[in-house]
C-alpha cells in the first residue's frame, strides 16, 4: 500500500514547456499591471507636492516603491523561467538527436549481424565465377562453325576474281589521248583604205608646179 497515493504520471517535456510559457504570459501581464499602478502613484505624488500636501505625496511614493519592488521580483522570475524554457528546449533537442543516433546504430548493428567478412568474400567469389562462366559461354556462342569459315573463304576468293575482272575491263576501255594541233590564232590587222584622198585646190596647184619643174 502506498502512503502517498498513486505516483504522478511522467510529464511530457513539451507539455512542461507549454506550462512555463503560460506562466511567463501571466507574469508579463502582472508586470504590466503593476507598472501602470507605479506610474499613477508617481504622477499623483507630483500633483500632491504641487498642492503642498507633502504627507500624502510621501504615502504615494511609498506605494510606488512597493510596486517597483514587486515588478523587480517578477522580472527576476520572468528571466528564470525563460532560462528554464531555453534549457528544456535544448535538452529535448539533444535527446531527440541521441535517440536518432541510437536508432541508427541499432539498425546498422542489425544489418551487419547478417553479414560477415567471410560471407562477403563468398559472394564476391561467386560473382566472379559466374562472370567467367558467362564470358566462356558468350565466346563459344559467337564462334562460327567450321563449314562457315570455309564457305566464307571461298566467297572471298570469288569476290577477288570479280574485282580483277572489273579492273581488266576498265583497262581495256581506256583510250589513248588524241593529240590535236593548236588552233590557228587569227589576228585582225587594221584595213588600209585604197582610195586616194582628194587634194585641196591649193595642194593641186603645188603638185602641178612640182611636176612642171621636174620636166
UniProtKB/Swiss-Prot annotation:
State any GO BP term from the record.
endosome to lysosome transport
Tell me where it resides. Answer: Cytoplasmic vesicle membrane; Late endosome membrane
Query: Where is the major localization of this protein?
Result: membrane
Does the UniProt entry include the keyword Protein biosynthesis?
A: no
Keywords carried by this UniProt record: Coiled coil, Cytoplasmic vesicle, Endosome, Membrane, Protein transport, Transport
Task: Indicate the transmembrane segments per the record.
Answer: none
| Keyword presence, Membrane | yes
Report the Gene3D superfamilies cross-referenced here. ESAT-6-like
Gene Ontology CC annotation, any one: ESCRT III complex
Coiled-coil intervals in this record? 10-173
Membrane topology per record: Peripheral membrane protein
Q: How does it assemble?
A: Probable core component of the endosomal sorting required for transport complex III (ESCRT-III). ESCRT-III components are thought to multimerize to form a flat lattice on the perimeter membrane of the endosome.
Could you tell me what this protein does?
Answer: Probable core component of the endosomal sorting required for transport complex III (ESCRT-III) which is involved in multivesicular bodies (MVBs) formation and sorting of endosomal cargo proteins into MVBs. MVBs contain intraluminal vesicles (ILVs) that are generated by invagination and scission from the limiting membrane of the endosome and mostly are delivered to lysosomes enabling degradation of membrane proteins.
Q: Which family does it belong to?
A: Belongs to the SNF7 family.
Its name, as the record gives it, is Charged multivesicular body protein 4
Amino acid at each position: 500500500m502506498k502512503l502517498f497515493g498513486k505516483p504522478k504520471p511522467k510529464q511530457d517535456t513539451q507539455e512542461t514547456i507549454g506550462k512555463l510559457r503560460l506562466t511567463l504570459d501571466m507574469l508579463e501581464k502582472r508586470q504590466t499591471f503593476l507598472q501602470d499602478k507605479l506610474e499613477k502613484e508617481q504622477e499623483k505624488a507630483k500633483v500632491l507636492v504641487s498642492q503642498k500636501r507633502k504627507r500624502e505625496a510621501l504615502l504615494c511614493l511609498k506605494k510606488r516603491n512597493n510596486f517597483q519592488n514587486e515588478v523587480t521580483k517578477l522580472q527576476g522570475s520572468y528571466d528564470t523561467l525563460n532560462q528554464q524554457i531555453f534549457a528544456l528546449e535544448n535538452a529535448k533537442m539533444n535527446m531527440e538527436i541521441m535517440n536518432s543516433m541510437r536508432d541508427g546504430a541499432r539498425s546498422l548493428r542489425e544489418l551487419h549481424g547478417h553479414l560477415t567478412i567471410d560471407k562477403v568474400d563468398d559472394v564476391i567469389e561467386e560473382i566472379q565465377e559466374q562472370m567467367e562462366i558467362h564470358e566462356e559461354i558468350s565466346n563459344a556462342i559467337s564462334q562460327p562453325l567450321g563449314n562457315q569459315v570455309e564457305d566464307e573463304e571461298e566467297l572471298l576468293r570469288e569476290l577477288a576474281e570479280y574485282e580483277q575482272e572489273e579492273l581488266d575491263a576498265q583497262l581495256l576501255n581506256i583510250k589513248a589521248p588524241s593529240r590535236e594541233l593548236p588552233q590557228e590564232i587569227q589576228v585582225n590587222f587594221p584595213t588600209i583604205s585604197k582610195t586616194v584622198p582628194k587634194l585641196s585646190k591649193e595642194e593641186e596647184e603645188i603638185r602641178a608646179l612640182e611636176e612642171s619643174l621636174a620636166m
